[in-house]
Amino acid sequence: MGDAMDFDDSAALLEQVNRALENATPLRIQGANSKAFLGRIVGGEILDTRAHRGIVSYDPTELVITARCGTPLVELLAVLDASQQMLACEPPAFADDATVGGMVATGLSGPRRPWSGSVRDFVLGTRIITGHGKHLRFGGEVMKNVAGYDLSRLMAGSYGSLGVITEVSLKVLPKPRACLSLSLEMPSEQALLRLAEWGQQPLPISAACHDGRQLHLRLEGGEGSVAAAHDRLGGEPLNSSFWADLNEQHLGFFDEDQPLWRLSVPLNTPPLNLPGEQWLDWGGAQRWLKSTAEAAIIRKVVGDVGGHATCYNHGLIDEPFHPLAPALLHYHRQLKRQLDPRGIFNPGRLYAEL
């Protein structure tokens, strides 16, 4: 895009990977390190992606943007905002210098996720340095091109364990014309029932969170539909900054006085019988739990309803991610061996076996 900060550092990244392959040196891939608290502790030589940055291409009419992995997420969002467009999955940054590569590698999505999709759903194509020492392109840069989608999307949420993402093409969407946030007093049990009921109706809900006392809603869409939904649902006005604070974990609930767990459960799961304080997010499909209960107890309760639990405190437990079933772990190990046969990329970040 011609910015003075644009720089293609892919040759240096490829050289470092090939040197690591020759010497069997594990690599710890990182950008701004803003999400280092997620996953297992990783050793190895640091591969820093931040110098490889810049918007490669952006066509607002095609709803596609392509950026290098070290591009600060805030810069990409500013470019989109100038054209009244957005990343609909609302990825959290957790730091001002968080990178696009880290956004894709962790695959984290914000409050809009159940209504718009995840980071993975918006990945159209990638360029990746593989464990074979090759710099390859997968997928496309237009929405109609489906070649290579699966491999590109596998990078989302892989935590750098399958390769070095050097470039990514993302689908973007127009910003909604109207947005209104509301709060309604009700217990969590009633909130889940109401959300299940509203989910069957054409309401422009784009975020829903219950903080143990109030149900917070965000309405987005055309001015008429948002106004009509407000008239129907009622509620008191809520500052729209609530959603960014929730997404970035700036609210008091997220203060680190107790271990923090992210619980992913089926949408209509009743309140979980676990010690500690819980918030409902994603309309109930994501629960935030602050609890000193043992990991095995939390995962047993969550697993019994078909969900999984991730610990958000770095180094607190040996396995922060929910254990995989044997068949699924076998599949993950096969995939790792195919893409990273020497096992140099973020070894053990997700699981000890990977």
PLM regions and their residue ranges:
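Conserved glycine-rich FAD pyrophosphate-binding loop
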Residues: 40-42, 95, 236-354
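N-terminal glycine-rich flavin-associated loop
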Residues: 2-29, 49-96, 108-141, 176-186
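Short amphipathic beta-strand starts and helix->beta connectors
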Residues: 49-52, 164-169, 198-207, 271-277, ...
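N-terminal accessory segments
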Residues: 1-34, 302-326
